[in-house]
Amino acid sequence: MPKRVVPEEARRRRRPTRQGVVLSETLIVQAALRMLREHGSAGLTARRLGAALGADPSTLYRYFAGMDDLARAIGDELMGRALDRWTATGDWRADLRTLGLALHSSYLAHPQAAVLAASRVSGRPREIAVDETILGILRGAGLPDPAAVRFYQAFIDLALAFAALDAGELALSAEARTRDEEMWDSTYARLPATTHPNIATTARLLAARMLHSAYPVVLDTLLDGIAAELAAAGARATD
């Protein structure tokens, strides 16, 4: 006689933990985000997470297939938080810009989590909602599907790549980050014009600029490219 398949919800813990809370995916992800902030990715283990939640570590596997599955859920949560803060206006450029900045900001709010999750594809509902939204904006702007997919990839990869890059800097110790930032004054600004004329000429500008993320600038460049493609398509249509 075949074994009865137990529904997923029935496998999950309904009794309160030692901390007096009833576990859920959301609660576990929130605890994981706190743990990443305090201990970094090396400190995120099932044992430590279980202890923080007042539950046996094995209980976590009722909710997630493993720590890799949890990492995907963390990325999904960060995606969802960005979408929750975003409001559509109907202007494709404004909507893409604010959504891109919201995604970047959501990941930077949790640098250790961003380093862990920015490169992952979760396939979870909130990530899917973000992807559907981006494609909807691009197609709604008038791009044909091949161009919409091309710019979708450029848009989401740009947001996540800069999220990972900028989060990596924020995840450094304060001492290491300060040393890196001071390098523009302590080293670059002192290079002689005889050997490094271009750096010497722009050293002060570099020192001021390199303390900021390039993401907004590059995002605007991408949006300019989308606008140019839409304009070219419109011109061809009127010929």
Model-derived regions: residue spans:
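Basic, helix-initiating cap at the start of DNA-binding domains
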Residues: 1-52, 65-72
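N-terminal intrinsically disordered/low-complexity leader segments
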Residues: 1-23, 195-208, 234-239
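Alpha-helical structural segments
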Residues: 26-34, 38-39, 69-85, 94-102, ...
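Short hydrophobic/aromatic patch on the recognition helix
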Residues: 54-64
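Amphipathic alpha-helical segments used for helix-helix packing
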Residues: 75, 104-126, 132-133, 164-171, ...
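Hydrophobic alpha-helical connector segments
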Residues: 84-126, 145-148, 152-155
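Hydrophobic alpha-helical bundle segments that form small-molecule/ligand-binding pockets
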Residues: 130-185, 207-208, 226-230
